[in-house]
Amino acid sequence: MKQALSLIGVSFLSVVSSLAADKKPNIILILADDMRASGMNFLGKEQVQTPNLDKLAGESTVFTNAHIMGGTSGAVSMPSRAMLMTGKYLYNLEKQGATIPNSHTMIGETLQKAGYNTFHTGKWHSSYEALNRCFKEGKAIFFGGMWDHWNVPLYDYHADMNYGKRRPVIHNQAKSNKVEYEIGEYMYSGKHSVDIFTHEAVEYIQQQKDKNQPFFLSVAYMSPHDPRSMPDEYMQLYDQSQIQLPPNFMEKHPFDNGELEIRDE
C-alpha cells in the first residue's frame, strides 16, 4: 500500500511539490472542528489525555505558530475550512466560505489533475457544488454547522448533486401519524459522529489498498464543536472535580447575542 501522509490543518505546499515525484503518496487530511491547542496534551495541557495525537505529533512537524484568522460572523470553522481547502485568506473568501466560486481552486481539484482519487466523509459546511468539485466520491456527508452528534442527518455522494432528499419522520407516534420530512438521506441514531466518519474512512482505505491510483481522503469531524457530547467511556477518563477551569470561564454568558440558548461554548 502506498505511503500515507497525514495532514492536520497544515499548508499543502509540501503535498503539491511532491506530485512531481514518480511515486505519488496517498494523502489523508484529518480535520477536527473548533479544536484548540489547549485541548492537546503535547502542547502543554497536561490534564488532557490525547495519546494518539501525542504519538502523531512526536513523529511529525507541528506548526506551533500557526493561528486561525477567525471569521467576520459567528462561524469560525466554516471560513477556516474554506481557507484550508483554497489557500485563500479570510478576506478573499466569498460569503465566509459558505460558497466557493470556480475561480477559487481547491486542493482536491489540483490533486484530481495529478491523477488522484478524491474522497470525503464528515462535515462540509459549504455548497454542494464546491463539494462535488473538490471530491469525486464520498459517504456519510453532513451539510451543516452544528448538530446532535448522536443523530446526524447524512448524505452519500451524488455526482448529480441531488442532495435535496428528505427522510420521512413521525415524531410522536402515540399522538399522531403525521409524517414530516427532515434533511438527510439517512441517520445512524445512537452512533456518535466520530465513530461514523472514522468507520467510513477506514472502509475507504481498505478498498483502495490494492488499487494503483493514489488517493486523497478528507475526514472532517464535527467534534469537538458544540453541542458537547461524547461517549461515556471518554467521560469516565476524567474526575470532573479535578478539572482545572481557566480564569475566564463563566457559567453563563453575561448577555444574549441571539445564540444564548443554542450554543454551549
Regions inferred by a protein language model and the residue ranges of each:
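Formylglycine-dependent sulfatase
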Residues: 2-4, 9, 19-265
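N-terminal signal peptide c-region/cleavage motif recognized by signal peptidases
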Residues: 15-17
